[in-house]
Amino acid sequence: MKHKKKNRLVVAISVALIPYIGVTGDIPDSFRDLWGEQDEFYEVKLYGQTLGIHRIKTTPTHIKFYSPESILDKINLKKEKEKELSVFFTNSFSRNGNMSCQGNTTIQYNCNYIKTKSVDVIVDDVDNVVNLFIGNEFLDSEAHNDEYHQLSRNVKKAFIQSQTINLSDSGKYKRLSISGNSALGITDTSYAVLNWWMNYNKSNGYSNNEKTINSLYFRHDLDKRYYYQFGRMDRTDLSQSISGSFNFNLLPLPDIDGIRTGTTQSYIKNTDKFIASPVTVMLTNFSRVEAFRNDQLLGVWYLDSGVNELDTARLPYGSYDLKLKIFENTQLVREEIIPFNKGRSSIGDMQWDIFVQGGNIVNDNDRYIEKQNNHKSSINTGLRLPITKNISVQQGVSVIDNKSYYEGSLKWNSGILSGSLNSEFSFLWGDNAKGNYQSISYTDGFSLSFYHNDKRVDNCGRNYNAGWSGCYESYSASLSIPLLGWTSTLGYSDTYSESVYKSHILSEYGFYNQNIYKGRTQRWQLTSSTSLKWMDYNFMPAIGIYNSEQRQLTDKGGYISVTITRASRENSLNTGYSYNYSRGNYSSNELFVDGYMTSTNNGDYHEAGMRFNKNRHNAEGRLSGRINNRFGDLNGSFSMNKNRNTNSTNHSLTGGYNSSFALTSDGFYWGGSTAGLTKLAGGIIKVKSNDTKKNLVKVTGTLYGDYSLGSNDNAFIPVPALTPASLIIEDNNYGDNNISILAPTNNDMFMLPGNVYPVEIETKVSVSYIGRGFDPNGTPLSGAHVLNEPHVILDEDGGFSFEYTGNEKTLFLLKGRTIYTCQLGKNKVHKGIVFVGDVICDINSTSSLPDEFVKNPRVQDLLAKNDKG
C-alpha cells in the first residue's frame, strides 16, 4: 500500500515527542492535536501474508484494531482457540516501530519479526503495514504446513469462461473454430468444469459443422491429496498435476461419461513445468503452418526455411495426433501427422499417484465406436511410482469392451557430465495392437534429440478399441552444434504409414493396390547460420541443403540466404535475399522485406507488421496486426499471392481472438486473454477515486502484461487455478498529480477453478501545496491549524506543506479564535507540487467556512477547543 509521505512525517514527529512520552502534560501545545488518537488505514500482514486493508486507531506509541473480527475471519485458527484470541484483539498494542525494517528491501537481521505466545505487532510506517504475529498455539497447524499450498480465504464463487476464436480462409479452403473453457465455483472444495468447441469447415464447395463437449463434470477435492469427479471427461486433466500428471503416449484412454477418482498434485509446493514431445518441421521456403487436433484449429505459425521447432506452449495438454498443414504462397503443399504428448513434469515429486475411471465411451468421430448407436464401456487405471528423484515408472491399464491394453513407461531425467539428459521409454501390449515409444534429448552446449513412435494393429486394419487404424511408425532426430560462430542443425525424419482405409492416410500418400494404402516420406535437412553485428545492423547469412523422398517423388536441393535486420526496442526492419536450387523444381531466387512496429500505452499492446516477397514465379504480400489489452488478445493477417505464369491471384486470411469474463453475485466483469489456461480463476479489481482520470492504477503480474485502470473501472484478471499467482498494485503517477493508493500492494492467491479474489482499490489524486501564510500585517501565522487537511500546523515562519485532495482553491486557517482565508491563486502545478509563495491571508468569520468544513467533526472539535481557550 502506498501512502508514505504523511507517515514519514508521523515518524519524525513521534521521534521528536519521545522525550515527552509518559509526561503528557509537557507536550508542546502545537503538537497536542497530533498526540491524540487518529484513524488511519494500514495493510495488515500475518507472517508476511496480506490480510487486506483495515482501519486502525493509532497514537505515536500504540495501535488498536477498529474491527478485529474482520481480521480474524481471514486467519486459519483452531476452533477451540478463536474466543480466547478474540479477547487479545480487543487490546491496544505497542507499535514496536524500532523493530521494523521501515521499508528497507535489503535483508536486515531480525527486523519485522517477534516471537510471541499471544499477539504482537510491528508497525512499519514507511510502507503503511502492520505486521501481525500470533502464537503458534492459536493457529491451525495446516496454516503453517510447508508441504502444501493453502487456498486463499478471501475469495468469492463465480462463473468464469474463456473463449477462443481461430479462423483460416484460403479461398476454396475455409475453417472457423470456436472453443470455450468454463469453471463454476460451488463449495470451498468443489467446482464444475465445461470445455467445448465448434467447427465450421468448407472445402471445394463441401461444408460441414461440428459441435463437441469434451468435458462437463463436477469435482470435489479431499484433504489436498485425493479427488473424485463425475460427468463427461476427456484425458486432458490426466496429463496435468490436477489429476496426478499421467503422460501416456500409447494407452487408449477414450472420453467417457462416468466417474474418476485418484490422487492430485495440485497443492504440492514444487516446480511445475510442462514437458512435451518435440514438433519438428523442416521447411525449404517461408511457410504458413496450421496445427489441428481432429478438426479443431489450434494455432498458426509463420516460419522461415530451415529446421523449425514449433512452440508447444501454445498447444493444449494431452496425448493426441497433431496434424500439420503446410502452405507456401497460400497453397497447401503437404500435410504431416505427428503423435504429440504434452503434460506436467512429475519427476522428483517423490510421491506415488494413482487414478481409476470408468464409464460409457463417448462417440469421438467414430474413433472408438463403429456406429453412432453403439454403446461401449471402458475402465482405465494408472499408477506412477518414483524410484529416485530422477527416475519414475508409470503403468496403465485400459479395458475397453472387454479388450485389455497395458502401457508401461520409464522416465529418466538426470545430469550427465556437464549436460542435461531427458528421456522416456514406453511400450504398449494389447488385444490386436502393440506399440513402443522413445524420446531422448541431451543438451551440453549442443543439442541432440531422438524421437521414435511405432503403433500397429493387426493386419494394419482398424481397431476401434485401441482407438486407431493402420500401422504407423515415425523417426525423427536433430543435432544442433555451435562451431566457430556458426550454428549448424541437422534434422532427419522418416514416416511410414499403412492402412486398408484410404481416408486414414494423408493426402501425400497414394493408392498402393486393391486392398492396401501405403505411404512413406523421408526427409533430411542441414542448415547453418550465423549472426554478425555492425553498428545497428545484424547480418544473418544461412546456407542449407535438403533431400525429400515421397512415394516416387524425390526432391533434392539447397539454398543460401542473407538477412539484414535493424531493430530497436519497438521497431524492426528486415530485408533479405535467398537462392533455392531444387533438382525437381529447378532454381529460384527470392527477395523479401518485412518489418513490424510495436507500442505499449497504459497497458495496451499494439503490433503491426508487413512482409513482401517476390521470386520469378510469384509475388506475395502479407499484413499482420495484434492488439492485446484487458479486453482480450486480437490478432490477424492477410496475404495476397499473384502467380505471374497463370496471372492468377490467391488470398489467405487468418485471425484469432481470446478473452474471458467472470459472473459473480455482484456483477459481470470482462477480462483479457487467458493465454491457453484450461482451469480458470482470477482477480476482480474495482477502482474508486476522488477524481475522474483514467490510468490511475497499474496492475502487474497478469498473464499478458500490465493492466491500466482508471476511476470507477472494473476488470476481471484471469490467473491459473491451483497455481500460486500474485497481482501487484502500483500507482500510475503521471503528469501534474500525486496518486495515493489504499490497497494491498501484493495480492498473493491460490484458488480453485471458479473462484475470484476481490481487490478493492481506493485512489486519491492530490497536489502538494508549499508556501508561507501571513496575516494582513505581514506577521507569520505560526502555529495556525490548516482546516483543509488534518494534522497540518504552520511553522514558526508561517511555512506550510501539505497534500490536498479537494478542489477548494482557498486555504482556511485557524489561529487562536481567528479564522483566516488565504487565496492560493492560479500557480502552475509541476510534478504534483504547487509553489504558492508568500500568501497574505484575510481575517474572516466562521460563516465563511464551506459546509463540508462546518460539518467536519475534526474542524468542529478544533473550533470548540479554541473557543474554550
Curated annotation (Swiss-Prot):
Localization terms from the record: Fimbrium; Cell outer membrane
Superkingdom field: Bacteria
Keywords: Cell outer membrane, Fimbrium, Membrane, Plasmid, Signal
Pfam families, A to Z: CooC_C, TcfC, Usher_TcfC
Record has tRNA processing as a keyword: no
InterPro entries on file: Pilus_assem_C (IPR031917), Pilus_assem_E-set-like_dom (IPR032636), Usher_TcfC (IPR035224)
Main location: other
Signal peptide location: 1-22
One cellular component term from this protein's GO annotations in UniProt: cell outer membrane
Cell membrane keyword on record: no
Role summary: May serve as anchor for the fimbriae in the outer membrane.
Record protein name field: CFA/I fimbrial subunit C
Species annotation: Escherichia coli
Gene name in the database record: cfaC
